[in-house]
């Protein structure tokens, strides 16, 4: 769904590659673990330490890949379209392999990974279908696809993914709205089976970190889907 009719910020909008290239230096100073890592920690259908190989789609600076390793995942590969983000991921030393490329066309053989993940990136895709199909191709039989994201409620209330650059300008990154029905349709078309869904709300921990967000108390801020491939 086109985000522009919902936009109430009016920030200049960059492409995904240009936006994350500009944001790479300060990304981890502005993205809170509350957005995705806390949701991942709450998932009960994933025994992270049991996975020998995982793929991190749109791995960015590697913060999620590093979390996966800390949770006991044996080896993590990552792919991202932004070289500046991949440089930071490489510096972490958490990845076995890092690749430059699109999340819907990964240069890896199929049915390799028992765990495929994506965190905070789905809103940058105009169509979820290719993502879910590629994750299914890459997942081993019985494998999982964990997708964590920015809740469409906030996008539909006018707040795109955005950041402040060195000069103090607020800039948005190309965003699209995907209803939960869109996720379900794309997943079922690819033959995934739902294992779990979690939604996170703006709570006291959020408000402590961002006091101005008190006006958003109780609103859904992020989500976590877990999908399972047939064995």
Task: Report the location of each language-model feature.
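Conserved class I S-adenosyl-L-methionine
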Residues: 1-49, 63, 67, 144-174, 207
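Class I SAM-dependent methyltransferase SAM/SAH-binding core
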Residues: 55-57, 61-105
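A short acidic, Gly/Pro-enriched loop at the edge of an enzyme's catalytic core
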Residues: 104-116
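A short SAM/SAH-binding and catalytic strip from SAM-dependent methyltransferases
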Residues: 115-127
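A short glycine-rich, Lys/Arg-flanked "PGG" loop and its adjoining helix->strand segment in the class I
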Residues: 129-141
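Short alpha-helix
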Residues: 175-198
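Core SAM-dependent methyltransferase catalytic element
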Residues: 210-231
